[in-house]
């Protein structure tokens, strides 16, 4: 009966001009007809037509086979395991369990306990020697206090590693598994795998650069700082390499997001060019939401580590900048100030790389997709496609692809500008304090010289009276 009424209505519509309300009614009838036809084809509950499937059935062997992200970035994961920074493990092939796991009693974690204990002994010995040397020295000037604080602050990430990194191991494993699942879903939906052709050489290069740069920076401090002993350098190599490794990890993930979004955007453009792409757009919208949630999970998984990372960079940059400027004002430029400027440049470079890469990744996943969807000519597509495009845009608005440190801060270019403004404020205060000390020293020196001259004049006058 319903089919007969629809056919009669369509016959009548051919012979009249439709107003907008009639056209909307016609589209609704056509959509109902398609849904009824689909229900006749299967006996499932109608909820499957509007509710997203909770999980795509997958085989662990297929997950391993198509996990290009893991295979291309495996070297960085192994480096983190060797350094004891993030002891997560990859599940053996064929084992029906999450592909990346985290447990407190795994082999990787036992090794992390051991290597961390050895490194802690070295760091504590060097820290004790630095503290004892500072206490025993007679020079207690404010500048010397600042100078000693710089190299003590660099040790802070080591002591906070268990709290900042290990404690979030389960979230990191979840993030890795999200990448694995996303690649398989992408293959199912688009029919094409995601390929990361540049990540393999980039990851290997960054692994080597992380340790090479650590050696260069610490040895430069040994040669440029007058009281930096060679034995003290061994307490800093692994710390700087760890900071470099986390920066490399962030760069690799942001690059992967950019590569995935570029391939995804191309597939979206091809789908929009087809006839009646509404059903496919629904799957693409769900896939995009997964990609956005992955970016949010990256910030959540490493929130503590990168939060401390940014604080250490902020604090060390301020102290090193002040120390170098105050020494130049008081004593002139020396090799010591060059060493401090090396630290400042290094810290600001790390912050710039992290913020800039996060900005580009968010733009590629969010803004680029919005522009493609907004450029769709809605008058040239059917009503169902129009609604899907609108829902896609709403999904982008409600799930912004931002990298947020678990609610503490958004990682983007705005973080650089805010940090620089805060640094400038604190530096102005510290330099005012320094100039006040210099004025007081000059005033005291002038008074002392004046008193000495007066006493000498009085002694000369007394000698004249006696003669």
UniProtKB/Swiss-Prot annotation:
Q: Which UniProt keywords apply?
A: Behavior, Cell membrane, Glycoprotein, Membrane, Olfaction, Receptor, Sensory transduction, Transducer, Transmembrane, Transmembrane helix
Its subcellular locations are: Cell membrane
Q: Does the keyword Transmembrane helix apply?
A: yes
Tissue distribution is: Carbon dioxide-responsive neurons coexpress GPRgr22 and GPRgr24 in the maxillary palp at both larval and adult life stages.
InterPro entries attached to this UniProt entry: 7TM_chemorcpt
What topology in the membrane does the UniProt record assign? Answer: Multi-pass membrane protein
What's the name of the protein? Answer: Gustatory and odorant receptor 22
What are the GO BP annotations of this UniProt entry?
response to carbon dioxide; sensory perception of smell; sensory perception of taste; signal transduction
Family the UniProt entry places it in:
Belongs to the insect chemoreceptor superfamily. Gustatory receptor (GR) family. Gr21a subfamily.
- Known role: Gustatory receptor which mediates acceptance or avoidance behavior, depending on its substrates. GPRgr22 and GPRgr24 together are sufficient for olfactory carbon dioxide-chemosensation.
Topology feature Extracellular, residues: 128-144, 220-238, 326-337, 436-467
